[in-house]
UniProtKB/Swiss-Prot annotation:
Functional note: Constant region of immunoglobulin heavy chains. Immunoglobulins, also known as antibodies, are membrane-bound or secreted glycoproteins produced by B lymphocytes. In the recognition phase of humoral immunity, the membrane-bound immunoglobulins serve as receptors which, upon binding of a specific antigen, trigger the clonal expansion and differentiation of B lymphocytes into immunoglobulins-secreting plasma cells. Secreted immunoglobulins mediate the effector phase of humoral immunity, which results in the elimination of bound antigens.
Domain Ig-like residue range list: 6-103, 112-210, 214-318, 324-423
Residues in the Cytoplasmic compartment per record: 521-546
Matching CDD domains: IgC1_CH1_IgEG, IgC1_CH2_IgE, IgC1_CH3_IgAEM_CH2_IgG, IgC1_CH3_IgAGD_CH4_IgAEM
Biological source species: Homo sapiens
Encoding gene (name): IGHE
GO biological process: adaptive immune memory response; adaptive immune response; antibacterial humoral response; antibody-dependent cellular cytotoxicity; B cell antigen processing and presentation; B cell proliferation; B cell receptor signaling pathway; complement activation, classical pathway
Residue intervals on the Extracellular side: 1-499
The keyword Protein biosynthesis belongs to this UniProt entry's keyword annotation: no
Disulfide-bond pairs as recorded: 15-105, 29-85, 135-193, 239-299, 345-405
PROSITE patterns: IG_LIKE, IG_MHC
Protein name stated in the entry: Immunoglobulin heavy constant epsilon
Length: 546
């Protein structure tokens, strides 16, 4: 992580919670969000004696930065005494110091409203030789208040004109005036009125408003990608100017550095768009170390038809850092995508948002055109996330090839990369298991059967299979037929079917034979017992009386 100075906050108790007869009290000072260690905390107790204790630094989970607390215990006439906590962070700067002055306890109070007003231009719209900035501090509970002016974050050593405090009812107000030369005001610096009150800081800032860009013309600066910065080691920044009207004049793009050091040679490209406008691109190689250390680069655009130059600047993103979490997986097969498979990669909880995503096939980087990645989006917390999607062919996944999703980010350690591998198995959905041997004969079975081997070629229907459009590996509705293949050799359930068929055949033959024998036996029995009567009857029938 890059060097980060601490934020300092006073820690006090509510006055109503401190006994009136207390002989000693404890107050604290919190320094948080700094990197690296250490910080040095000292106290100014005035005329009182006190003992201090600084707790060991703790690591903040999300950013990896540090926080520590220093405690001061004082005795004596502490109620009327102001105390100053002084925090120094040498890694940020040898002279970096933040002072917080506050009392032992906090009373209920109304905080002040801080607002900066500036003098207006003359009748011609021009700034006067001197500019007055007026800081109005109003609406606060009467009490000690301190006003300081800052220029680009640094305390200004100037004589200030501060009015006396006026009180209206239960609230008070005051004001402070700062006079600047026109040169300082036009230098694009930021001026801040900082008010310290009851151990808290309130402020308002102002600067000369940027001139509006010429209508229709826009300029943009892009930072180097993490891939170019940390992998290729050849970072570049790009200045893009769009919506220029073609003319005989020349568009000039000039690069510079805030440090005043020379810049590298840039490349330039002009392209005429379909709407008749001109787009100009200038690409500048930058030093990896210069960029990481926070150098600021500026692109200045001039053209005879522009009323004023356009200025754009870029530098390394500030703020906390967090390494990305990478998850790669294969999506389940879908009925309409038989010849391809989709791999997905979720990358989340990283800061800042600058990230590069690549896919590798058997450790060889794939072209960017083969995959698509979303723009970084904010999470519910303070981090960002992206999704990346890659389509692979059947031939690639049937060879058990390995695919790697790699994220390049400055907070990833030790090499600024985090990667996860995923392999697709034609035998198992999502698959990381080894694929099985492909069978070679085709049978048709109901989709209600489970655990059947896959159809020839994975999910492509076999020419001899006419039992439906489903696939053996797809867990579809039971009423759907699926095409599956029989493994080499005879399947166990084939012999079972033959045995059942033979048993049923023999049973039916036995049943028919038994019925036939029974009928023959009954017929013979009836013949032996009733022969005379039967003959008489037949005689009577054949020879009727005349």
């Amino acid at each position: 992580a890059s060097t980060q100075s601490p934020s300092v906050f006073p820690l006090t108790r509510c006055c109503k919670n401190i006994p009136s007869n207390a002989t000693s009290v404890t107050l604290g000072c919190l320094a948080t969000g700094y990197f690296p260690e250490p910080v040095m905390v000292t106290w100014d107790t005035g005329s009182l004696n006190g003992t201090t204790m600084t707790l060991p630094a703790t690591t903040l989970t999300l950013s990896g930065h540090y926080a520590t607390i220093s405690l001061l215990t004082v005795s004596g006439a502490w109620a009327k005494q102001m105390f100053t906590c002084r925090v120094a962070h040498t890694p940020s700067s040898t002279d970096w110091v933040d002072n917080k002055t506050f009392s032992v306890c906090s009373r209920d109070f109304t905080p002040p409203t801080v607002k900066i007003l500036q003098s207006s231009c003359d009748g011609g719209g021009h700034f006067p030789p001197t500019i007055q900035l007026l800081c109005l501090v109003s609406g606060y509970t009467p009490g000690t208040i301190n006003i300081t002016w800052l220029e680009d974050g640094q305390v200004m050593d100037v004589d200030l004109s501060t009015a006396s405090t006026t009180q209206e009812g239960e609230l008070a107000s005051t004001q402070s005036e700062l006079t600047l030369s026109q040169k300082h005001w036009l230098s694009d610096r930021t001026y801040t009125c900082q008010v310290t009150y009851q151990g808290h800081t309130f402020e308002d800032s102002t600067k000369k408003c940027a001139d509006s860009n010429p209508r229709g013309v826009s300029a943009y600066l892009s930072r180097p990608s993490p891939f170019d910065l940390f992998i290729r080691k050849s970072p570049t920044i790009t200045c893009l100017v769009v919506d220029l009207a073609p003319s005989k004049g020349t568009v000039n793009l000039t690069w510079s550095r805030a440090s005043g050091k020379p810049v590298n040679h840039s490349t330039r490209k002009e392209e005429k768009q379909r709407n008749g406008t001109l787009t100009v691109t200038s690409t500048l190689p930058v030093g990896t170390r210069d960029w990481i250390e926070g150098e600021t680069y500026q692109c200045r655009v001039t053209h005879p038809h522009l009323p004023r130059a356009l200025m754009r600047s870029t530098t390394k993103t500030s703020g906390p850092r967090a390494a990305p979490e990478v998850y790669a997986f294969a999506t389940p097969e879908w009925p309409g995508s038989r010849d391809k498979r989709t791999l997905a990669c979720l990358i989340q909880n990283f800061m800042p948002e600058d990230i590069s995503v690549q896919w590798l096939h058997n450790e060889v980087q794939l072209p960017d055109a083969r995959h698509s990645t979303t723009q970084p989006r904010k999470t519910k917390g303070s981090g960002f996330f992206v999704f990346s999607r890659l389509e692979v062919t059947r031939a690639e996944w049937e060879q058990k090839d390995e695919f790697i999703c790699r994220a390049v980010h400055e907070a990833a350690s030790p090499s600024q990369t985090v990667q996860r591998a995923v392999s697709v198995n034609p035998g198992l959905a999502g698959g990381s298991a080894q694929s099985q041997r492909a069978p070679d004969r085709v049978l048709c079975h109901s989709g209600q059967q489970q655990g059947l081997p896959r159809a020839a070629g994975g999910s492509v229907p076999h020419p001899r299979c006419h039992c439906g459009a489903g696939r053996a590996d797809w867990p579809g509705p039971p009423e759907l037929d699926v095409c599956v293949e029989e493994a080499e050799g005879e399947a166990p359930w084939t012999w079972t079917g033959l045995c059942i068929f033979a048993a049923l055949f023999l049973l039916s033959v036995s049943y028919s034979a038994a019925i036939t024998l029974l009928m023959v036996q009954r017929f013979l029995s009836a013949t032996r017992q009733g022969r005379p009567q039967t003959s008489l009857d037949y005689t009577n029938v054949l020879q009727p009386h005349a």
